[in-house]
């Protein structure tokens, strides 16, 4: 089941992204799908949900390229999340299982908002709220480190 990390921002998995009862009850207006392989719910338009795809693959053979692709999207994605939350639009961020790709974006957003804390401190905060988080240190750690450095400038 998806978890609300901060007011209006949820992390979940592919099942949550297709659960219309959950989407309606939490008033989700934006779904950010951090996968290449999972289709959006067909009723999104009828439910008034905006769908955004962040095409990050589950194939980690070329993880250096994946890190760069993800890192270069962080700023725009964080600004978008911030804008939509300020418009009181609830957001579900998901990947396949909710453990790595989606959690990475949530971590990047929390880093964007809580600039005084480093990524390790924010990861611990995220982990207390969402025990499913399993950041694959070999896959997105470089992107998170770069993002951490950029935010400190």
State what each model feature region is:
Residues 89-107:
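A phosphate-binding catalytic loop at a beta-strand-loop-alpha-helix junction
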Residues 2-91, 111-151:
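Cysteine-based protein phosphatase catalytic domain of the PTP/DSP
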């Amino acid at each position: 089941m998806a978890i609300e990390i901060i007011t209006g921002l949820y992390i979940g998995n592919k099942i949550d992204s297709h659960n219309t009862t959950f989407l309606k009850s939490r008033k989700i207006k934006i779904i950010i799908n951090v996968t290449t392989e999972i289709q959006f719910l067909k009723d999104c338009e009828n439910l008034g949900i905006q769908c955004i795809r962040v095409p990050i693959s589950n194939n980690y053979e070329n993880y250096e390229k994946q890190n760069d692709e993800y890192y270069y999207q962080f700023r725009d994605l964080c600004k978008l999340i911030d804008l939509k939350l300020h418009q009181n639009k609830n957001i579900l961020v998901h990947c396949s299982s909710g453990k790595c790709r989606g959690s990475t974006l949530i971590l990047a957003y929390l880093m964007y908002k809580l600039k005084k804390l480093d990524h390790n401190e924010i990861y611990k905060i995220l982990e207390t709220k969402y025990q499913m988080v399993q950041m694959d240190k070999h896959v997105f750690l470089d992107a998170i480190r770069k993002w951490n450095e950029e935010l400190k400038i």
